[in-house]
């Protein structure tokens, strides 16, 4: 970041505005007869990774486009670090960067040339542009392909370059729209580490994703979006807890003890256990404090356990519970 850009961003942010990166109330966007976004409220604290999770066509990209000043809301309002996205467009744009679902790069140029051009356009000197391009190519594992034209890049390599181009100047607020779409598992994990480093060095991240494991691994908070609305919001743990209790798994050392273990579990836990397979007893943990009593009762009955484990509801279960059957994608809904 140049000295001039740093000074501008420092003046815009101000110490009194550092608590909240995004505040949105009642955001609405209508395309024809379709309310693509229908009264969305968001509150994104500074210095966190915040995920918008939802199926295709849920409205995630439209929300991003309104928050980044690319679309004007038809209702509601939103502020970035206290600055209105409609009335203070130019100020907001100095505080953000956006990586979309398609790369804004020139296939006829090399990776290094693309990054240097972006850097020069952002106000870096020629030497700063060269240095920053080299740093980003190394950061995203593209140094060996620095001089290769993009028409010879794989989809995953292009995705990494697209993210790198958006980080030439690290903005206080970074929007990542499906940042790991099309990447192989190893590259996805590398990208996650890069995203975590951005937050560690001072940025706030708002990302959209369809990958449940990605939201679970990365996000401090998640808003589940379905049919243009926020249907749930919270930490991954809070969302899992909201749809059901954790499940206790008791693997018995001897299968012949199964019936007695079920009887004791039902008596102590006050719930109905199940036996999904021989020598395995499972029960919802309606009252976690009673688990210790159960273990004592099983020991007194001389029932030995091979293993004891507790399983939380998964984010997959949260997603399916909140967005119907988990298979609806609303492909008929077109987001610009």
Give the positions of each predicted feature.
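Short, surface-exposed acidic/glycine-rich loop or hinge patches that mediate macromolecular interfaces
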Residues: 83-86, 230, 255, 285-288, ...
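Preference for bulky hydrophobic residues occupying beta-strand positions
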Residues: 29, 42, 250-252, 283, ...
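Structured loop/turn residues at secondary-structure junctions
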Residues: 145, 155, 253, 286, ...
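ABC transporter nucleotide-binding domain
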Residues: 192-285
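Non-catalytic connector elements of ABC transporters
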Residues: 270-336
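ABC transporter nucleotide-binding domains
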Residues: 19-24, 29-226, 231-232
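ABC-family P-loop ATPase nucleotide-binding domain
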Residues: 1-28, 325-336
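Short phosphate-engaging motifs
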Residues: 88, 214, 257-258, 290, ...
């Amino acid at each position: 970041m140049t000295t001039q850009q740093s000074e501008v961003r420092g003046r815009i942010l101000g110490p009194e505005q550092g608590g909240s990166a995004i505040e949105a109330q009642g955001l609405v966007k209508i395309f024809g007869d379709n309310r693509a976004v229908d009264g969305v409220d968001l509150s994104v604290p500074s210095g966190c990774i915040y995920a918008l999770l939802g199926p295709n066509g849920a409205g995630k990209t439209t929300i991003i486009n309104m928050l980044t000043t690319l679309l004007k809301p038809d209702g509601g309002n939103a502020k970035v670090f206290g600055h209105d996205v409609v009335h203070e467009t130019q100020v907001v744009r100095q505080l953000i960067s956006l990586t979309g679902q398609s790369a804004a790069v020139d296939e006829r140029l090399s990776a290094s040339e693309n990054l240097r051009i972006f850097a020069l356009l952002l106000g870096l000197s020629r030497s700063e542009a060269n240095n920053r391009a080299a740093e980003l190519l190394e950061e995203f594992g593209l140094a060996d392909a620095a001089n290769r034209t993009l028409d010879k890049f794989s989809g995953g390599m292009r995705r990494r370059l697209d993210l790198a181009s958006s980080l030439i100047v690290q903005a206080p607020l970074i929007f990542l729209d499906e940042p790991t779409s099309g990447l192989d598992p190893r590259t996805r994990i590398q990208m996650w580490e890069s995203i975590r480093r951005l937050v560690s060095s001072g940025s706030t991240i708002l990302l959209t994703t369809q990958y449940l494991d990605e939201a679970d691994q990365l996000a401090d908070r998640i808003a589940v979006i379905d049919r243009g609305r926020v249907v749930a919001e919270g930490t991954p743990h809070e969302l899992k807890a909201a749809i059901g209790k954790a499940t206790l798994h008791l693997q018995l050392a001897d299968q012949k003890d199964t019936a007695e273990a079920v009887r004791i579990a039902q008596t102590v836990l006050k719930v109905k256990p199940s036996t999904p397979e021989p020598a395995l007893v499972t029960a919802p943990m309606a009252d976690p404090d009673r688990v210790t009593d159960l273990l004592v009762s099983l020991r007194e009955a001389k029932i030995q356990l091979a293993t004891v484990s507790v399983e939380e509801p998964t984010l997959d279960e949260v997603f399916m519970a909140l967005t119907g059957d988990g298979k609806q994608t609303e492909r008929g809904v077109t987001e610009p």
